[in-house]
């Protein structure tokens, strides 16, 4: 995992841009000027630690160059295929495999790889720069475009520091979105003219004409709209376990030490169990909280003790929160209010002392159906059929009673899962202060992923997979872990696993409405029913850590101008 950056303006400061992302790549920095474009790279050495794995990397004739952030899984098979076609390799890195795959198949190479990636390819043969982002949005990729000047970077701060001739203007609609859903939804960023390349998308920039000629999707997830049982559960369990095992074994490959995050929840327990099977010396890292209502630590400890795992742990306290709160702007260069970012940073900091790579359970809820609001909507639909108007009823009641009745707020949090949005109650005031047009509707970015004909749980899973997962969860993990130069991998988000789960009927995936029912059944004996079949807690900090009852986004909003880098 690394930091990448590039642009077409010769006056920009590429050294400053890449230096501010050194935390993403402390093992070396390189800037390369090319005709019409510049690439920069900050390296975190994971595969092929030698100089041969350094980037930017170029083809044998120097016509094509690449900078790449992420990992390609199972790339050895692709490498063998390319060697049979006559390609020679001078490193053991996956970067060189991508480069030669592009030379062989052009832009279609991206359909042949699986992994987490943000890729930029410079091609003198047609004088273009092509960007590619992984299917789920695991790796970030920002770009700036004003109609002629174009640049990209792994983080927003890279864009801002590189584009030293630009006066950046805050996008008030992004602030408005943030105040409603606690993060800035893709493709927006905090600033106008700066965007994020959407997951599963490619972009082509014409260097000569200084314009973006393509921004399109290269992958479409097929979703099963059936509700009833279609396949025998034993067959599904066998296939699921094979895919989980395969994904974890592929993602354990590295030339540096690998560990796992173990929260005690369903997903991290399964990932850690399979990682331990692959390597009994794997280190696990866990967080505990002083408030037992937020602690799952005893479940993590139980699993670690059962399999004699190497467990490392730390307690996250209120003083830790106070200490790290003001540092949040260092990790997230735009407003972000997911409070689990704090313990994620601390567990990453602890892990980095022993390993360079960790596997996490992120994505399991979206892929296998694990959020509590899914179950509520499943029950509502079974009782009453589709009940979309219920959202409006609850929303109106919350606005009237927000200071009196916290039941309505809890109800809204659950019911909002149907759309995947959690509106803040000060909407009218926010619109006024931010000068937001009356016609602007925050839900527009989600409507493109709202598929009415899908069963309730599947519908919500798909929405969250496309919005909440890349916008919040994966952003949180990437920034918190990379702040300490730790690579996080997410085996439950492999292409094969995502496509497998969404190819199932809802009943096969969540039998009788049991959240993650198939996944839990597959690991009952190894993980234990007491860990698998209990109320979901989530990975968040106690609300008592805040000074008052303001929402996290309002706490962070008071410092919003500090995000002007």
Regions found by a protein language model. Name each.
Residues 1, 108, 167, 193-194, ...:
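Adenosyl-5′-phosphate
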Residues 1-326, 330-332, 344, 348, ...:
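Cysteine-centered catalytic environments shared across enzyme families
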Residues 28, 140, 268, 364, ...:
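Short hydrophobic/aromatic residue motifs in ordered secondary structure
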Residues 81, 162, 367-370, 500:
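Residues that scaffold the ATP/ADP-binding catalytic core of kinase and kinase-like folds
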Residues 128-129, 139-140, 160, 366-370, ...:
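Short catalytic/ligand-binding loop motif for oxyanion handling, primarily in non-cytosolic enzymes
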Residues 135, 147, 346-405, 468, ...:
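Active-site adenylate/phosphate-handling loop in enzymes that bind or generate adenylated species
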Residues 326-330, 352, 374-376, 546-548:
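Short low-complexity, flexible loop/linker segments enriched in glycine and/or proline
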Residues 335-338:
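Acceptor-substrate binding/catalytic loop of class I
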């Amino acid at each position: 995992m690394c930091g990448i950056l590039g642009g077409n303006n010769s006056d920009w400061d590429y050294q400053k841009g890449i230096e501010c992302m050194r935390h993403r790549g402390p093992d070396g920095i390189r800037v390369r000027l090319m005709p019409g474009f510049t690439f920069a790279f900050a390296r975190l050495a994971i595969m092929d630690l030698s100089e041969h794995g350094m980037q930017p990397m170029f083809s044998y004739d120097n016509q094509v160059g690449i900078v790449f952030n992420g990992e390609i899984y199972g790339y050895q098979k692709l490498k063998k295929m390319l060697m049979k076609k006559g390609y020679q390799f001078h490193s053991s890195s996956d970067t060189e495999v991508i480069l030669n795959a592009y030379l062989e198949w052009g832009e279609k190479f991206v359909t042949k790889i699986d992994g987490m990636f943000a890729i930029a390819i410079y091609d003198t043969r047609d004088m273009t720069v092509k960007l590619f982002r992984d299917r789920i949005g695991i790796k970030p990729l920002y770009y700036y475009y004003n109609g002629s000047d174009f640049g990209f970077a792994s983080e927003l701060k890279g864009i801002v520091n590189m584009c030293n001739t630009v006066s950046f203007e805050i996008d008030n609609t992004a602030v408005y979105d943030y105040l409603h859903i606690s993060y800035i939804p893709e493709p927006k960023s905090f600033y106008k003219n700066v965007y994020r390349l959407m997951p599963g998308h490619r972009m082509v920039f014409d260097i000569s004409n200084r314009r973006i000629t393509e921004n399109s999707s290269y992958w479409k997830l097929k979703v099963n709209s059936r509700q009833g049982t279609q396949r025998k559960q034993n067959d599904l369990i066998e296939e699921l376990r094979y895919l989980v095992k395969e994904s974890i074994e592929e993602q354990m490959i590295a030339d540096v030490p690998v560990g796992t995050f173990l929260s005690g929840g369903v997903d991290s327990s399964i990932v850690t169990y399979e990682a331990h099977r692959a390597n009994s010396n794997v280190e696990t890292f866990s967080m505990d909280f002083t408030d037992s209502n937020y602690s799952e630590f005893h479940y993590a400890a139980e699993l670690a003790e059962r399999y004699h795992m190497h467990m490392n742990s730390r307690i996250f306290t209120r003083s830790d929160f106070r200490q790290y709160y003001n540092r949040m702007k260092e990790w997230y260069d735009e407003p972000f209010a997911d409070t689990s970012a704090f313990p994620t940073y601390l567990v990453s900091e602890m892990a980095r002392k022993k390993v360079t790579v960790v596997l996490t359970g992120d994505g399991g809820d979206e892929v296998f159906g694990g959020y509590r609001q899914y179950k509520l909507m499943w029950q509502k639909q079974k009782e009453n059929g589709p009940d979309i108007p219920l959202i409006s009823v609850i929303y109106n009641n919350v606005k009237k009673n927000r200071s009196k009745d916290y039941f309505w707020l809890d109800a809204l949090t659950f019911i909002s899962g149907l759309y995947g949005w959690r509106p803040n109650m000060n909407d009218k005031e926010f619109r006024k202060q931010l000068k937001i047009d009356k016609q602007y509707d925050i839900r527009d970015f989600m409507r493109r992923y709202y598929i009415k004909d899908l069963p309730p749980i599947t519908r919500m899973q798909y929405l969250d997979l496309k919005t909440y997962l890349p916008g919040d969860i994966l952003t949180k993990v990437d920034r918190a872990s990379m702040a300490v130069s730790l690579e996080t991998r997410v085996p439950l988000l492999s292409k094969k696993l995502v496509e497998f789960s969404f190819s199932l009927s809802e009943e096969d995936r969540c039998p009788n409405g049991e959240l993650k029912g198939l996944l839990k059944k597959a690991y009952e004996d190894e993980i234990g029913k007491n860990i698998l079949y209990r109320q979901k807690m989530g990975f968040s900090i106690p609300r008592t850590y805040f000074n008052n009852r303001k929402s996290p986004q309002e706490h962070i909003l008071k410092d919003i101008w500090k995000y002007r880098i």
